[in-house]
Amino acid sequence: MGGCGHDDSEHPPVPAGPDLAAAPADVRWVNYQGVRLPVGADGPRNIDPSAATGFSHSPQGAALAAIVHTVRMSLAPDEHWASIAAHEIAAGAGKDAWASSRVLLSIQTPADPATAPRVRGYTLTDYNPATARVEIYTSFPDGSIAVNTATVVWVAADWRLRLPDPDATEPAVREAATLDAVVRLEAPQ
C-alpha cells in the first residue's frame, strides 16, 4: 500500500559545506612594516620577518593567508622579499613578473602611518580545499575603502598566494563605496 510519506533513507541529507562566513578563532594583531595583520588559531603558526607559514586547511586559514601574504609581499623590506616570495607565493607567471619588478625597487622603512591601510575584513567568494578567492577590505586614513581580490592555493601543506597572470585584464584592486565585508576583522588604529 502506497502512502504519502517520504523515506529519507533513499536520499540522505547533503552534508553542509564549510562555513565561509565564520570568523577566524582567537584573532590578535601583529605589526608588520607599519600595518597590523590578523593572526590566530587558523594561522600563521610560524611568523618571523622572512616568512609567515602554517595556516589551517580551512576557509579561515585561507582568508588569513590571503591577507597576511598580500600585505607582506607588498611591504617586504629588501633583505626579506626573496624569502617571502619563496615561502608565501605560489610559483607561476604572476610570481615571476612580481619578482622581476620587485628587484628594481627598494623598501627600507615601514609604511607611513599617515597613508598605511587598515585591514577591515574579508569575503570568501570561492572556496574548495585546493583554492580560495578572497576579497580583502582595507580602509585608509582619508576614509577611502579598497577591495583587493586575492587567490590562495594549497601547496606543500600550506596556503600560498597565487599572483594574477601578467596578462590578466581584471583589476586585482578596486575602490568600494562601502565596507561590505562578510567577515569583519577590525585592526586597531
Show which residues each predicted segment covers.
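N-terminal low-complexity, Pro/Thr/Ser-rich intrinsically disordered segments
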Residues: 9-42
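Glycine-rich, aromatic-bearing surface loops/beta-hairpins
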Residues: 175-189
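Surface-exposed, charged secondary-structure patches
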Residues: 90, 94, 100-141
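Solvent-exposed loop/turn segments at secondary-structure junctions
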Residues: 139-142, 167-169
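Core segments of small alpha/beta cavity-forming domains
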Residues: 33-104
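Short beta-strand edge/turn micro-motifs at domain boundaries
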Residues: 27-29, 35, 147-177
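Bacterial signal peptide processing site
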Residues: 4-7
